[in-house]
């Protein structure tokens, strides 16, 4: 809630709107209340043999309504896109109290405005999201994860293309600087994962059957590869612990900034 001068702020919780519907196997969709957590939706999809494309480290506290209101990206944007790409229907209460409901999940629908696209990313300025209809995906299968030491951001970003073999599907690509790697490791008692220290470390995850065949041209680099689930979770922890690791230092100022890759490569 945003306080207005001379008025008491109002805080509205959607936590009790937490029902997750059954997966519609015919359309590959699921309906969920705004208060359901991202983890709830992902587990419901997985139990039915499907996969929800948005994932965050805060999956068990982030609500679906919140991820839609902010158009959350998460760690699999390169494979599945932002939250807006998953949204096929929405229900919301407008400022005047009217309820807008489009939860049928029809992909071929040109009847007027795309309210989902308008409300997604609006952060509550256009209405309060109460339920959503989401697109699901078939699981990518077994994957391989690699941490690769890099000397520049240009090299790190280049690996997102040159480091992936033809025919393999890139599932995730993350770039972490040396400070972030060190802090995450210190927080969880993990050693530096590579032979040498590097200013930048790139995390790549590819769908390749889980045998590392999806990587290309990284054998001569400083690299560690995880094939089993426990080793992959350990490598991912260096990325997923970033927020917690920096917060442990004291008051932090966090910004979610998007820049074109060529610009980032110049850093």
Cite the ranges covered by each PLM segment.
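Short secondary-structure boundary/hinge segments and terminal tails
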Residues: 1, 62-64, 181
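C-terminal substrate-recognition/cap domain of FAD-linked oxidoreductases
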Residues: 137-138, 144-267
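Glycine-rich N-terminal segment of FAD-binding domains in flavoprotein oxidoreductases
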Residues: 1-17, 32, 52-54
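Short glycine-enriched loops at secondary-structure junctions
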Residues: 15-17, 126, 179, 230
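FAD-binding subdomain of flavoenzyme oxidoreductases
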Residues: 19-23, 28-175
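Short, hinge-like loop/turn segments at secondary-structure boundaries
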Residues: 7-11, 71-72, 190-191
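A generic structural signal for beta-strand entry/edge sites
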Residues: 9, 27-31, 201
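Short, acidic (Asp/Glu-rich) active-site segment that either coordinates a divalent metal cofactor
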Residues: 1-4, 10-13, 125-133, 206-215, ...
């Amino acid at each position: 809630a945003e306080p207005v001068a001379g008025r008491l702020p109002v805080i509205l919780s959607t936590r009790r709107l937490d029902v997750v519907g059954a997966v519609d196997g015919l359309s590959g969709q699921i309906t969920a209340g705004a208060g359901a957590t991202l983890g709830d939706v992902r587990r419901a999809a997985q139990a039915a043999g499907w996969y929800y494309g948005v994932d965050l480290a805060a999956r068990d506290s982030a609500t679906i309504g919140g991820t839609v209101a902010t158009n959350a990206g998460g760690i699999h944007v390169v494979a599945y896109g932002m939250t807006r790409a998953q949204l096929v229907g929405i229900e919301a209460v407008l400022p005047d109290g009217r309820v807008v409901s489009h939860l049928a999940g029809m992909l071929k629908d040109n009847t007027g405005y795309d309210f989902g696209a308008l409300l997604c990313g609006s952060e509550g300025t256009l209405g309060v999201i109460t339920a959503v209809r989401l697109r699901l995906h078939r699981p990518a299968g077994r994957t391989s994860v690699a941490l690769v030491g890099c000397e520049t951001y240009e090299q790190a970003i280049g690996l997102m293309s040159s480091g992936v073999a033809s025919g393999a599907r890139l599932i995730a690509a993350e770039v972490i600087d040396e400070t972030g790697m060190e802090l995450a490791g210190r927080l969880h008692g993990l050693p530096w994962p590579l032979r040498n220290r590097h200013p930048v470390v790139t995390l790549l995850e590819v769908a390749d059957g889980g045998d590392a065949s999806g990587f290309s041209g990284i054998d001569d680099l400083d690299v560690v590869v995880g094939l089993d689930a426990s080793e992959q979770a350990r490598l991912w922890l260096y990325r997923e612990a970033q927020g917690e690791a920096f917060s442990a230092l004291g008051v932090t100022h966090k910004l979610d900034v998007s820049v074109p890759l060529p610009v980032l490569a110049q850093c």
